[in-house]
Regions:
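A generic, lipid-embedded transmembrane alpha helix
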Residues: 57-66, 90
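Helix-loop-helix hairpins and the membrane-proximal interhelical loops
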Residues: 1-57, 67-82, 165
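Membrane-helix interface segments
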Residues: 45-50, 74-77, 102-107, 137-138, ...
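Hydrophobic mid-bilayer segments of alpha-helices in multi-pass membrane transport proteins
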Residues: 45, 175-182
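Helix-loop-helix junctions within the multi-pass membrane cores of secondary transporters/permeases
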Residues: 2-6, 79-174
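Short hydrophobic alpha-helical membrane-embedded segments
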Residues: 25-30, 55-57, 150-156, 172-177, ...
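Hydrophobic core segments of alpha-helical transmembrane domains in multi-pass membrane transport
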Residues: 157, 179-189
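Membrane-embedded alpha-helical segments in integral membrane proteins
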Residues: 31-40, 63, 151-161
């Protein structure tokens, strides 16, 4: 096959996705550790904190839910707010559908679970630059993007939860969640558009 019809190969696509995810680890690790600390400070035990991170794997949604839970908000409000924060995932899914929508159902289910901002941004960028990628190459690239991010998210959450147990109550971390959200929205506030 020529380079234009088979530009990468499945293993190379996976490694490319993994390589391109490395810079994001500088953000994912501390953010996950912060979640672990804040979750522990909010009263979640280690199993609850880790279960939350493994099941949800969506930092902004997790912090939103955690903040509302600490304020004794009704469960319906917590769930609705967490879903609202993650509405962007529906848009991400829709824009990835032309690229990976033809993959087997089990692969699409894995992609849906592993869809985070970083895996979306890296994958879509590659798909648009290299439209000749085959479906197996596209899925390999997508899985490569998350191959480091997900484990780092889990390990950093664990480290934060363990560290959070040792933080005295005198060092209240109530400011951590609002500061995190300001950090998330600040880039969007650079322009009036």
């Amino acid at each position: 096959m020529t380079a234009s019809t088979h530009p990468v190969g499945v293993p190379a696509a996976f490694w490319r996705g993994m390589r391109d995810s490395v810079p994001f680890l500088l953000v994912v690790g501390p953010f996950a550790a912060l979640f672990g600390v804040v979750a522990t400070e909010a009263g979640l035990d280690l199993a609850q904190t880790m279960g939350f991170s493994v099941l949800v794997i969506a930092g902004a949604s997790q912090l939103t839910a955690l903040q509302l839970l600490t304020e004794n908000a009704p469960v319906a409000i917590v769930l609705a707010s967490a879903l609202a924060v993650n509405l962007r995932m529906a848009m991400y899914s829709a824009s990835l559908a032309p690229w990976i929508g033809g993959a087997p159902l089990w692969q699409r289910a894995c992609a849906a679970y592993l869809l985070v901002d970083q895996s979306y941004a890296i994958s879509l960028s590659h798909y648009e630059r290299t439209p000749a990628l085959t479906m197996p190459e596209r899925m390999a690239l997508f899985l490569g993007t998350i191959a480091l991010i997900a484990p780092v998210w889990y390990v950093a959450t664990l480290a934060g939860a363990l560290a959070g147990r040792g933080i005295p109550d005198a060092f209240a971390l109530d400011f951590a969640v609002p500061v995190t959200f300001l950090a998330l929205i600040a880039p969007a506030l650079r322009t009036l558009a």
